[in-house]
Amino acid sequence: MSIRRKALIAAMALVAVAALWFATIVPGQNSTAAVQRTNDGKPNLNGIWQAVTTANWDIEAHQAEPGPRPEIMGAWGAQPGGLGIVEGGAIPYKPEALERKRQNLKNRMVTKVTNDPSRFDSGDPELQCYRPGVPRANYMPFPFQIFQGREQILMIYEYKASIRQVYVDPHLEAPVDSWMGWSNGSWDGDTLVVDVKGFNGHTWFDRAGNFATDALHIVERWTPRGRDHLMYEATIEDPNVYTRPWKISFPLYRRLEPNVQLLEFNCVPFVEELMYTPLGLYNPPDRPSR
């Protein structure tokens, strides 16, 4: 048998194996038999989860680009490319809101530091260590942990130890607006549905300047697709910013390393010089105050 014929047979065998693989494992296929369950029969969402996406840089499709201050940051500050998580490709901005988004991108590294605690008209809130809000907390490059109960579900995010309390029974109204909003949950079969309102209007969705106001309303759907991964979907509406509701979706994966746990990421000390030097309130820790 010639070498060329052997190579052809090997290639055909490889194609057959690949075809069998893709025929049996379809992306998004619901494998409910493998879903872990709690004592009351609900899907067991307990554990540490993390997204594998570049959405924190930009939730829309984007190419790799240099980041802010490339003369200092080089490749460290570069933006990786990504296919985006917005269904349909583009966010349906109103014209004036799209212009604000463009200004946000232009000014993402600007910090207008003042003594007025009610002002947040500056760059990306992540740059200044503010809480990320929803849905951004779910796709930042940090893990988060879910503690599931019948009446409440607790979500703790490694980034700044941000917390969400999902009220399943009974539902409660938000007492005040906040960075992470107010979450009420219910079960639709095996899907956890979380209705989120009560935002303070200061959060961004990513480093590209995509944003919403305090009229933001989000409906999340957390659906198990197997033993160790979920499909996350969120319908987003804000009549101040968008012409219609729109959706994002991406998978979440359970972290399975031995002794996996959330570690501390307290970013406040990392931004003290950035935030307080313009006010004359910062003294480096290795230099005595004057």
Positions of PLM-derived features:
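PEST-like low-complexity, intrinsically disordered acidic/proline/serine-rich tracts
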Residues: 2-290
